[in-house]
């Protein structure tokens, strides 16, 4: 059975909308890399979990609107709008370009997102 990489990405974002850190982590390979440009790169599941926990401590909600998704083999590219609600009551809508690479078992081995940090910080300040 072939791995449906686009479905895995959609399922990953569904876990984000639930703010389900354990669920999010279940999609990563042990040696995965999350390169959340312009943030520091997280290498390995413990570092990725630390970054997720750091984000979620101030979040009250998350949603994503995928504008375009392209799939080729074990790679998914997407253009999307991430909406992050903060516990402070502020909210940010951030355009993101993302790339996901998967191993043969359907686990994320590389997640690279590009976004403008200033766009995010201006909206939550």
Each language-model region and where it sits:
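Residue-level signal for well-ordered, solvent-exposed loop/turn and beta-edge residues enriched
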Residues: 33, 90, 106-107
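Hydrophobic/aromatic beta-strand elements that line small-molecule binding cavities or substrate pockets
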Residues: 52, 64-69, 81-82, 95-101
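Short, cysteine-centered beta-strand-loop-beta hairpins and adjacent loop/turn segments enriched
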Residues: 84-91
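Short beta-strand edge/turn micro-motifs at domain boundaries
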Residues: 95, 99-122
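A solvent-exposed, acidic/Ser-Thr-rich amphipathic alpha-helical stretch
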Residues: 21-74
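Short, low-complexity N-terminal intrinsically disordered segments enriched in polar/charged residues
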Residues: 1-30, 124-125
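Polar/charged side chains located within well-ordered beta-strands of beta-rich proteins
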Residues: 78-80, 113
